[in-house]
Amino acid sequence: MKIGIDLGGSHIAIGVINNDGFIVEKVEKRLLAKEKKDIETAIESYIIKNVKDLKEKYKISEIGIAVPGTIYGTEIIKSVNLGVKNYNLAQNLKREIDLPIKIRNDAKCAAIAESKIGALKDYKRSIFLTLGTGIGGAVIINGKLLDTGDLPGCEFGHMIIQKDGIKCNCGKNGCFEKYASMKALKNNLRASLGLDETTRGQELLDMIRKNGEDEKIKTIVGEYIDYLSIGVSNLINIFEPEAIGIGGSFVYFSDVLLEKLKNNIQDKKYLFNNRDELIIVPAALGNDAGIIGSCQ
């Protein structure tokens, strides 16, 4: 068995993966604001404690870690969402954990999992997007990640969709993820509705479901869908995939957002090549995709 770990901008999830690629046990926690001030210590202490506990229950052969950001070998070169640079997480963990450790970009991990056992397993050419704190992605061709050489590539979240737009944490302006990440949608809803920052995603989802025709909610959701449509259409025009999968916390909102997205792309005629059917599907593995894919 293997241990898969998914590091997000606001959470850590650790799962034990069996030989069929499925999770048999999982532990997770949200990162508190005070923990984010010393993010490296918070990450390492939580991983070390739980890996040691799980090793007592299961025979573990290796560890895979899914991380948002640019990875080179076992080093996190830059993670905007975690706020770290040149962070050799694997090296630090090996001081306490005697197991092979590999680290990959989280969106690529999720894409691998969805293409092997999830929503994209029936397609040879697909694109996978993770919409959460930021936006990540990957291109899958014949069951394999698109080879981008020494650099990670597929940084879809930092595709510019608005000239001189909102400042991104990466330093550029107008990045896709500043407009179309789930964090952007939630923040805009809170601001428009005068809600506190502590208002959780589930509460916002309930508001959209119950009051979808409210003018403020309708406007915010409509603007969000339009920005998301532009980015997704750009990717379709470039790669012409058979299908697109969307994961991250978008999955929880898919019943109120997915059809709007597909209809908007078709109605606005953003696609260069017309399609009879636009296949955009929610991730079948949910937020577990990163955990599972990190071990593939």
Predicted regions and their residues:
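Glycine-rich phosphate-binding loop of actin/hexokinase-like ATP-binding domains
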Residues: 121-179
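Short clusters of small/polar residues that mark proteolytic maturation junctions
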Residues: 27-29, 81, 150
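Active-site flanking residues adjacent to catalytic metal/cofactor-binding acidic residues
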Residues: 5, 105, 149
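A charged helix-plus-loop insertion that forms the helical arch/lid used to bind
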Residues: 76-86
